């Protein structure tokens, strides 16, 4: 199809002419839909990517969900494409926030999420683990706010996710309280350590290492 050809030629241009060494597909599982939006197990685009020698060395990452409700983490139809593990994000946030019944989930995520991959630890490169991303709270915001505050963009706080598994540690927003500051810094280190030590590929949001807020 012409759309597949356009995507492949665009990737080759970015990779060969401009030196880009990897691509991320936002809502990428949508690319696996066929006629009448039916999910395919062997999508032509992913098959063509795998067979293209000029794209074989690129790093490929995808979101395993789309706007139509399709979610295929454990059976994403392209084994060489790493997939964002949203269960890792949610499980780690809940554990370090102190939610009940979150310890078992923490253990599963540390071991490579075998509960999501037929009882086996995920193959290296398949699970892209993350705590934060470009959407939503940064790491510093995650430990500083119980709710979103998207007021400056004129959307009246209607945009963005409402369910963030965040915890402000007693004070909403910036605080000069030394005890709150100490606890927030500790929690950021806990979350970062969990990300870096768990089995899988860690994805670190730029700026989280220095406490950036947005």
Which residue stretches match the model-derived regions?
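Active-site groove signature of glycoside hydrolases
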Residues: 8-34
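Conserved alpha/beta catalytic core and glycan-binding cleft of carbohydrate-active enzymes
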Residues: 19, 32-35, 40-206, 211
């Amino acid at each position: 199809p012409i759309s597949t050809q356009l995507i492949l030629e665009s990737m080759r241009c970015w990779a060969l002419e401009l030196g880009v060494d990897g691509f991320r597909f936002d809502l990428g599982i949508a690319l696996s839909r066929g006629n009448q939006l039916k999910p395919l197990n062997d999508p032509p685009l992913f098959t063509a990517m795998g067979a293209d020698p000029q794209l074989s060395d690129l790093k490929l990452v995808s979101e395993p969900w789309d706007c139509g409700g399709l979610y295929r983490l454990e059976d994403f139809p392209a084994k060489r494409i790493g997939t964002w593990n949203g269960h890792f994000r949610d499980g780690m946030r809940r554990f370090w926030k102190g939610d009940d019944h979150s310890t078992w989930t923490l253990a599963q995520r540390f071991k490579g999420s075998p509960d999501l991959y037929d009882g086996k630890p995920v193959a290296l490169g398949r699970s892209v683990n993350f705590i934060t991303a470009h959407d939503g709270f940064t790491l510093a915001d995650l430990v500083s706010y119980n709710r979103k505050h998207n007021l400056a963009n004129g959307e009246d706080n209607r945009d963005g996710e409402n369910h963030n598994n965040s915890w402000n540690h007693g004070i909403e927003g910036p605080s000069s309280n030394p005890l709150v500051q100490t606890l927030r810094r500790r929690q950021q280190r806990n979350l970062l350590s969990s990300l870096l030590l768990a089995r899988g590929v860690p994805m670190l949001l730029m700026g989280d290492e220095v406490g950036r807020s947005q």
